[in-house]
């Protein structure tokens, strides 16, 4: 995801 840099 864009909000969480950790996962897509």
Curated annotation (Swiss-Prot):
The UniProt record lists the keyword Magnesium: no
Domain of life of the native organism: Eukaryota
Keyword set, alphabetical order: Allergen
Record's comment on post-translational modification: The N-terminus is blocked.
Other remarks in the entry: The MW of the complete protein is 65 kDa with a pI of 3.6.
The protein's name: Allergen Fus s I3596*
Organism of this sequence: Fusarium vanettenii (Neocosmospora pisi)
């Amino acid at each position: 995801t864009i909000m969480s840099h950790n996962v897509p």
